[in-house]
Amino acid sequence: ESYPMFENDNFTFSQISTSRCFFLKMNFNEGSVCTDPAVRKAIAMGIDKEGFVENLLEGNGYPANGTFPAGSAFGGDKVTTETYDAEGAKKVLEEAGWTDTDGDGIREKDGQKLQIKWLTYPSRQELPLLAESAQATLKDIGIDVDINCTADNNSVVQDPAAWDVYAMANVQAPTGDPEYWFTVFATSDATKN
């Protein structure tokens, strides 16, 4: 609301992307549907990241291609990822044997419904919006999303049977060094792995 007050020759506005990223951590433990590479690929193709940025973040940001922003020397546009392609996601699932045999709009394979348990938390106000947006677009490709938005996320994530996808927000390189992210999220003894 105070922005117009600064619109004059006495002020110069500049901006730079931060390393804050909204990302999905997928559960590779036995029993999770995310052990299926086709499901992981379909999730990546079935979430409208561009729409999330434009509509829910009001254009404040851009879809990430990886863990780090495009301007960094160690990520961003050097990484490729799936783009939003609902029809392509449906094809990936069909080819992997996930079909809607009972006509309810949700795919099944070997008697198992394609449902993902989506864990997130409310303290980053965008995360529940991301969950609802993903729930809508993934339903369009035949994936049912059960959202658990809880402040107790750090306890819930310890139970591998309680989640398939964990949506988080994090500053990925707070010191400008990518090692932080790998130390916290990616190594086998990482605190958030």
Language model features with spans:
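Extracellular/periplasmic solute-recognition and catalytic clefts
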Residues: 1-30, 54, 63, 169
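Ligand-site clamp/hinge motif
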Residues: 1-5, 144-146, 151
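Short glycine-biased active-site loop of nucleotidyltransferases that positions the nucleotide triphosphate
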Residues: 14-15, 109, 156-160
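Append "and occasionally in soluble cytosolic enzymes with long acidic Gly/Pro-rich linkers
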Residues: 35-136
